[in-house]
From Swiss-Prot:
Binding of Zn(2+) 1, residues: 70, 72, 85, 88
Keyword annotations of the record: DNA-directed RNA polymerase, Magnesium, Metal-binding, Nucleotidyltransferase, Transcription, Transferase, Zinc
HAMAP family per record: RNApol_bact_RpoC
Source species taxonomy: Bacteria, Pseudomonadati, Pseudomonadota, Gammaproteobacteria, Legionellales
Name of the protein this chain belongs to: DNA-directed RNA polymerase subunit beta'
Length: 1414
């Protein structure tokens, strides 16, 4: 018995560890792991099926095959444990040691490790400073290398071909040593003095000036210093001993029919052993050189194939013509060790089945089929049966359960009570894809799911399946109940809005009972209270939709949060009173007194959650659902073809549009408009027409005329089924209704361009063959896209999770002073996102002042909840500074003050919340949803008509910002700058609307004018870009040569001629140098200057420009000289969307990116090169910056214009790296957040900004060293921000110069691979490369992230595991401190003295005590 305890003790867990280190293994280390040398390639004996001795499965080396039984059977059972059998040499122990005991092979000749040779950059190559080709020539015996030149004039490391070697031998005899093969490389590596090399490189780096050399030296220095610091020896990259994997990890399994299935590794090992043994034999025989060499080369190839098959040369194929899986293949890729077995494992106690709807369940319940429950809860049932004495043994209990007697069902009921189960639906895109429920036993074989959680799971009941898991331990049950229960997940983690919201038929039911109808039965009745209304309705005295007057009791929350009751009379619809019956006290009646669309219901639940708490909300949501189902059934809403009402004006609208199109075709034929313009205009006409038809249809469908009580005709909202469904938000949208009863409109081709001829029919009328054919185009693309994009989106999510996985809230407050400024997001005059939504749930970084009284409204560090955001709105404050994830200075992770509200819970985020993963899921989840939804509108082109004017939406005053204008003769202003804005301020002076004013817009108001809502204040042509005169004078053409740089086009009808500039590509050689431009001169033919400067009024004309004026014409200020046609965009849906988001997060440099001004100053143009223009910016202090800009780029600044640093000079998509470099971190964050949000906003998806900020923070983790100062960092090295901070703190203590850095932006893939943790990086992508680099550097992984801890099988350092890790670290820290104190206290002589005294002392207890003190 004592032995047994000892045995169990010896098999306890491995010791606690804090970090993992990866290093190169020295030959000694490999031998120390090994339990014996594998000498034979045999695996098992074909007759006895026992492993061969000294073979690949040898029991003597690797351990016994059966538990506690040696191979020959002499020793069996536990009592002989630990004995080594003298007959077969096998140790008597557990068979599972065959999973952990390794062997080794002594190689007859050293072999290079392929990873350090071929994985780029080649480590061996860098160390030796020899090219990879040369190393391969040496290794594969094509050349000699001089190892020791001796007294000869050969260079060390010089390569000699066979002939050269023989010549050298003749010339110098044996004064020099030259070798080939891995021995040569090994010797070269052994001769490297790493320390001296590092010193030499550092000195050389300081003296060198050339860029390329610096780069090369830095690369070498990095690798060498890595070897120096890690204690790896270079020669260990050459193998002399090869470890052999334990046999149970490369099994040989007998199949039926006498054949064997074997792991590929066995084949690879066999080849190595065969070749090694043959080589040994040849060496013993002193075989001729050429044969030995060939054998050595074959051995090298065999080892290469074993380590990483296919990396060099052709891969070794197995019997069935497929590549053999090598050791490297075992760990990399989706089916490799990391992703298949370590990051995700299959779990026991789980089942799956089809789901069906459970409308009678409560929110916290799920229906579990009895059959499944019985199987899942088996162990619990067994123990209960034994406890009750119904069964004596497990076997008896098993029998009872199999017979399914009544006592078993009773016990199952008990076991299941309050034992939560987890339900999961694949794909689990965010954390709401797994939730906990209390099981309710149901008959049948399908799981019943509560309808309200379908949104969270994205589930429907068309055959979806779900998996059930049982949390076994008490802790697991507790977590499931308190954190994962569906009732605790009412809010969406991505945006903080309720996700337990009724949808579809429930909404339809609620909408139906809250509608009112003119002249319904019982209209105008008065009731004393709500109960009376219910009785009247039940006795058919009053209709659901009748307008009635009722006295209701209303409880409203006061400031203190108590409910104050009051009575009042309300005039409302009877159905709303029925709904009011179930509304909890504390909600105002106004929230119910309206048709309950989906938005209204969401608002109702949101208000309930914020004001009355979770419990009330959950109960209320359930009641709403029951009521919605009930009345949706009562309403009898359905769809018939007659519900699709086609408007009568449709024909007229369409024929009008056709006339317009014909008119434009005429203009095109006569050359008045270009091909591009014609196309744009036609598409615009049809887009507008489609909207008009849709509007007519909506007017027709949404309103019906009825007679009221007096017999007069009145209009009321229609009860048309389709209208009700789309209006309530239950199903369908205006866009879909438009296709059913309006016109289908323009279609897109698969490449996104729009087909000019629209489909004028709708689905009610039916499509003809041509229209149907055009439709299939877009529809089919939608289907193809869906398949591709689901994968894309999943991959994006994976990268996001990987980059953010180690970001956890680690402290309450980091104490930073940095912050970001928040403003409402305004686009084209619409406030797309008001300030309240952007700052809700954040922490103020600076106090907010009342703009009128200058009093402090809100203090610094205030948490902005709904109430405080209302205060901001009341005082119309439009910019505040708030804390942000980007500026947080927490050492690891982030602090809760910088993050703000936990969106899924509604309070400030708790320490330990894994916000990185939440952010990644919130951004990734809609990606998948959206991609799956491209095809729903059947590829109908929804291109917005191009904006061509500014119409003010609110009354107020005009302010013109950064706007340069010139005044035309008629008195209008014309904008001649690009970055100008027109702002509308309300009477309080707060900004309501912002509009970008494009170049060339005519503005009809002045700065400070008052405007009324609906007034048009600016106009322009959206399809062309004008060039406008800023001075009056006479035109002169320069370099405009007919037939060379320009062509005349004459309009036959009007006789007008216009001039078109030809593109440089089409010009003859002589014309390529010419730069067509127009200049303005005065009466004396002298150049005129632009106002306020010495810059001549020259206007360069890009290719494709239309000139409307002739040479010598007189022009006024603000006239249009020329027009540059603009091409239109393709349709943008999330297709453009998903790749766009990926590009932003990958920080890719866009093609033809915008060119930004590197410094602030005045623009001028210098001498051009062949195909590039030269733009010079001169700063006020006289420094200049030159920029070469390709000729075809449209430069948006003119000579003499002043630009600010970071302003756009040449149009194009902006490059995030430029923004970071020129405008700083905050501007970059702002740019990425807005760009990503725009993509999602187009799809109507709400994501809170802070999630995107969290990802951006991770992309900005690294900095580039610009000046290393006194630190050990290298120039231009990329280092973690925190590491630089640490190094600098050390230097400051010594009064040295600190390192200077600049932030750099890494794309999410790069950032994931550049993370400090090599385990996390290796399990993400490019496993081989990551592990190679890590092992050379002897990297240490502190296991700070979530992934690393999952991989080593620990609790994650987040959530409930956070405190466990904190305690563990604290204990570890304490023991280190104690050790240090001990070391400080006792000197060696003191210890010696104490020890001798202790030994002398007679009482042994004291001696023990003294030793303890030591």
């Amino acid at each position: 018995m004592r032995d047994l305890v000892k045995q169990l003790k010896s098999e306890k867990h491995t010791a606690e560890f804090d970090a993992l280190r990866i290093k190169l293994a020295s030959p000694e280390e490999v031998r120390s792991w090994s339990y014996g040398e594998v000498k034979k390639p045999e695996t098992i004996n074909y007759r006895t099926f026992k492993p061969e001795r000294e073979g690949l499965f040898c029991a003597k080396i690797f351990g016994p095959i059966k538990d506690y039984e040696c191979l020959c059977g002499k020793y069996k059972r536990l009592k002989h444990r630990g004995v080594i059998c003298e007959k077969c040499g096998v140790e008597v122990t557990l068979a599972k040691v065959r999973r952990e005991r390794m062997g080794h092979i002594e190689l007859a000749s050293p072999v290079a490790h392929i990873w350090y040779l071929k994985s780029l950059p080649s480590r061996i190559g860098l160390l030796l400073d020899v090219t990879l080709r040369d190393i391969e020539r040496i290794l594969y015996f094509e050349a000699y290398v001089v190892v020791d030149p001796g007294m000869t004039d050969l260079e060390p490391r010089q390569l000699l071909s066979e002939e050269a070697y023989l010549d050298a031998l003749e010339e110098y005899g044996d004064d020099f040593t030259a070798l080939m093969g891995a021995e040569a490389i090994q010797r070269l590596l052994r001769d490297i003095d790493v320390e001296a090399e590092v010193e030499a490189l550092r000195t050389e780096l300081q003296t060198t000036t050339s860029e390329t050399k610096t780069k090369k030296l830095t690369k070498r220095l990095k690798v060498l210093s890595a070897f120096l610091e890690s204690g790896n020896k270079p020669e260990w990259m050459i193998l002399t001993v090869l470890p052999v994997l334990p046999p149970d990890l490369r099994p040989l399994v007998p199949l039926d029919g006498g054949r064997f299935a074997t792991s590929d590794l066995n084949d690879l090992y066999r080849r190595v052993i065969n070749r090694n043994n043959r080589l040994k034999r040849l060496l013993d025989l002193n075989a001729p050189d050429i044969i030995v060499r060939n054998e050595k080369r074959m051995l090298q190839e065999a080892v290469d194939a074993l380590l990483d098959n296919g990396r060099r040369g052709r891969a070794i194929l197995g019997s069935n013509r497929r590549q053999l899986k090598s050791l490297a293949d075992m760990i990399k890729g989706k089916s490799g060790r990391f992703r298949q077995n370590l990051l995700g494992k299959r779990v026991d106690y789980s089942g799956r089945s089809v789901i069906v709807v459970g409308p009678t369940l409560k929110l916290h319940q799920a229906g579990l089929p009895k059959k499944m429950a019985l199987e899942l809860f088996k162990p619990f049932i067994f123990s209960k049966l034994q406890l009750r004495g119904l069964a004596t043994t497990v076997k008896a209990a098993k029998k009872l359960v199999e017979n399914e007697g009544p006592e078993v069902w009773d016990i199952l009921e008990e076991v299941i009570r309050e034992h939560p189960i987890l339900l999961n639906r694949a794909p689990t895109l965010h954390r709401l894809g797994i939730q906990a429920f209390e099981p309710v036993l149901v008959e049948g074989k399908a799981i019943q799911l509560h309808p309200l959680v379908c949104t969270a799971y994205n589930a429907d009941f068309d055959g979806d399946q779900m998996a059930v898991h049982v949390p076994l331990t008490l802790e697991a049950q507790l977590e499931a109940r308190s954190l994962m229960m569906s009732t605790n997940n009412v809010l969406h983690p991505a945006n903080g809005e309720p996700i337990i919201v009724p949808s579809q038929d429930v909404v339809l039911g609620l909408y139906y009972i809250t509608r009112d109808r003119v002249n319904a039965k019982g209209e105008g009745m008065r009731f004393a209270d709500a109960q009376e209304v219910v009785r009247a309705y039940e006795n058919d005295q009053v209709d659901l939709h009748a307008r009635i007057t009722v006295r209701i009791k209303e409880g409203i929350l006061n400031e203190a949060g108590e409910i104050e009751e009051s009575d009042r009379l309300v005039n409302t619809a009877a159905g709303r009173i029925l709904l009011w019956q179930i509304v909890p006290k504390g909600l105002p009646f106004a929230l119910v007194d309206q048709p309950m669309t989906k938005k209204a219901v969401t608002k109702l639940l949101d208000f309930c959650y914020r004001n009355l708490g979770l419990k009330t909300t959950v109960i209320f949501a359930d009641k709403l659902m029951y009521m919605g189902f009930h009345y949706a059934t009562h309403s009898g809403v359905s769809i018939g073809i007659n519900d699709l009402v086609v408007p009568d004006q449709k024909e007229a609208i369409i024929s009008r549009a056709e006339d317009e199109v014909r008119e434009i075709e005429k203009q095109y034929a006569s050359g008045l408009v270009t091909h591009g313009e014609r196309r744009n205009k036609v598409i615009d006409i049809w887009s507008r027409t489609n909207d008009q038809v849709a509007k007519a249809m909506m007017e027709k469908i949404a309103v019906e005329k009825v007679k009221d009580a007096e017999g007069k005709e009145v209009a009321q909202s229609s009860f048309n089924s389709i209208y009700m469904m789309s209006d309530s938000g239950a199903r369908g949208s205006a866009a879909q209704t438009r296709q059913l009863a309006g016109m289908r409109g323009l279609m897109a081709r698969p490449d996104g361009t729009i087909i000019e001829t629209p489909i004028t029919a709708n689905f009610r009328e039916g499509l003809n063959v041509l229209q149907y054919f055009i439709s299939t185009h877009g529809a089919r693309k939608g289907l193809a896209d869906t398949a591709l994009k689901t994968a894309n989106s999943g991959y994006l999510t994976r990268r996001l999770v990987d980059v953010a996985q180690d970001l956890v809230v680690t402290e309450h407050d980091c104490g930073t002073e940095a912050s970001i400024e928040m403003m409402p997001h305004i686009e084209g005059g619409d406030v797309v996102e008001p300030l309240r939504e952007r700052v809700l749930g954040r922490i103020l970084a600076e106090p907010v002042m009342d703009p009128k009284s200058r009093k402090e409204l809100l203090a610094k560090d205030t948490f902005l909840d709904e109430r405080r955001v209302d205060i901001l709105e009341e005082h119309s404050i439009d910019r505040v500074r708030v804390r942000s994830a980007i500026t947080c200075e927490a050492r690891y992770g982030i602090c809760s003050m910088c993050y703000g509200r936990d969106l899924a819970r509604g309070h400030v985020v708790n320490v330990g919340e894994a916000i990185g993963v939440v952010a990644a899921q919130s951004i990734g989840e809609p990606g998948t949803q959206l991609t799956m939804r491209t095809f729903h509108i059947g590829g109908a082109a929804s291109r917005a008509t191009a904006a061509n004017n500014i119409e003010v939406k609110s009354t107020g005053k005009i302010k013109l910002r950064n706007l340069k204008t010139v005044e035309q003769a008629q008195g209008n202003l014309v904008a001649v700058s690009r970055s100008g804005e027109l702002v509308v301020q309300d009477l309080q002076g707060s900004e309501r609307e912002h509009y970008k004013v494009p170049y060339g817009a005519t503005i009809s108001v002045r700065d400070g004018d008052s405007v009324k809502a609906g007034q048009i204040v600016a106009q322009w042509d959206p399809h062309t870009h004008p060039i406008i005169t800023e001075v009056a004078g006479t035109l002169r053409f320069v370099d405009l040569v007919d037939g060379v740089t320009m062509n005349r086009q004459t309009d036959e009808l009007t006789g007008l001629s216009s001039i078109v500039i030809t593109s440089t590509k089409q010009r003859s050689a002589s014309g390529k140098e010419l730069r067509p431009m127009v200049k303005l001169v005065d009466k004396n033919d002298d150049d005129l200057f632009l106002p306020g400067g010495k810059v001549p009024a020259h206007y360069f004309l890009p290719e494709g420009t239309f000139l409307t004026k002739e040479d010598g014409t007189t022009v006024n200020i603000g006239d249009v000289l020329a027009r540059i046609p603009q091409e239109t965009s393709k349709t943008r849906d999330i297709t453009g969307g998903l790749p766009r988001v990926a590009d932003l997060f990958e920080a890719r440099r866009p093609k033809d990116a915008a060119i930004l001004a590197e410094i602030s100053g005045v623009v001028s143009f210098g001498k051009d090169t062949k195909d590039k223009g030269r733009l010079i910016i001169t700063a006020p202090d006289g420094t200049t910056h030159e920029e070469l800009i390709p000729k075809w780029r449209h430069v948006s600044v003119f000579e003499g214009e002043t630009v600010e640093k970071g302003e756009v000079i040449a149009d194009g998509p902006r490059d995030p790296h430029d923004i970071l470099r020129l405008l700083g971190v905050n501007a970059l964050a702002n740019y990425i957040v807005n760009e990503v949000q725009e993509v999602y906003r187009l799809q109507g998806v709400k994501i809170n900004d802070k999630h995107i900020e969290v990802i951006v923070r991770q992309m900005l983790r690294k900095v580039k060293i610009t000046q290393p100062g006194d630190t050990d960092l290298l120039q231009n090295e990329q280092v973690e921000r925190t590491r630089v901070r640490e190094e600098n703190e050390k230097i400051i203590k010594k009064d040295g110069t600190v390192a200077k850095v600049e932030p750099i932006l890494l794309g999410i893939t790069k950032a994931s691979l550049a993370t400090e943790s090599f385990i996390s990086a290796a399990s993400f992508q490019e496993t081989t490369r990551v592990l190679t680099a890590a092992s050379v550097a002897g990297k240490r992984d502190d296991l700070r992230g979530l992934k690393e801890n999952v991989i080593v099988g620990r609790l994650i350092p987040a959530g409930t595991g956070f405190s466990y890790h904190q305690q563990r670290r604290a204990v570890a820290g304490k023991s280190v401190e104690e050790k240090e104190i001990e070391e400080k206290r006792v000197t060696a002589s003191e210890a010696e003295q104490a020890l001798s005294e202790a030994l002398k002392s007679s009482a042994p207890q004291e001696a023990k005590a003294a030793q303890k003190d030591e």
